[in-house]
Regions:
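N-terminal prepro-regions of secreted/extracellular proteins
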Residues: 1-93
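Mature secreted bioactive peptide module from preproproteins
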Residues: 76-185
């Protein structure tokens, strides 16, 4: 009886520690940039691609914060990603980005009405020149850049802001982890 209680207390302590580490390890986005926007140098030879509005009837990713989104069930979390699933969702002040493995589509979402555009840089692990997908469609919109990446490769997203008048990129920025192009982790 005593051993059973000890196990329950140990499990509860472990779950509490895990929940605390998730909350402190992934802080919520601020309403604005902490120290203002700071210019970012992009790698030489980066190609800028203007994103297009998704077609009618296309399921677009959510622009709401992950913390506000409904929690997935454990069964759904273990299932293989659906064809239109957006992987590697990454957000920074005013911008959100993700990668749809079916069709190699980069999504760039603009979340702030500040006169700037959302930008999602895409880097590969196999030496392809970096590209940036720009969303000039305005606040609360998604733009897509349809690319073709090597199926055996991985991509990494860099989300930041872009000023179309000056052609400059600005922090705050955020990076995703490596995302398999074929969607299979």
């Amino acid at each position: 009886m005593r051993e059973n209680r000890r196990i329950k207390v140990g499990v509860l302590a472990g779950v509490s520690a895990l929940a605390f580490s998730v909350l402190t390890g992934a802080p919520a986005l601020a309403d604005g940039p902490a120290d203002g926007l700071q210019e970012v140098e992009m790698p030489a030879g980066v190609r800028i691609v203007e994103g297009l509005a998704p077609g009618a009837g296309v399921d677009v990713p959510s622009l709401e914060d992950e913390a506000d989104a409904p929690v997935m069930s454990m069964a759904a979390a273990k299932a293989a990603p659906a064809a239109n699933t957006c992987l590697g969702t990454t957000a920074a002040y005013g911008a959100k980005g993700c990668f749809q493995h079916n069709g190699d589509i980069v999504w760039a979402g603009d979340t702030q009405k500040d006169g700037m555009s959302a930008a999602v840089g895409v880097y590969t692990d196999y030496g392809r020149a970096p590209e940036v997908c720009i969303n000039r469609l305005g606040v609360n919109t998604w733009a897509t850049c349809d690319k073709d990446y090597r199926e055996t490769g991985n991509v990494r997203l860099r989300v930041l802001r872009y000023d179309g008048d000056t052609g400059k990129f600005y922090q705050p920025e955020s990076w995703s982890g490596w995302i398999p192009v074929d969607g299979k982790y």
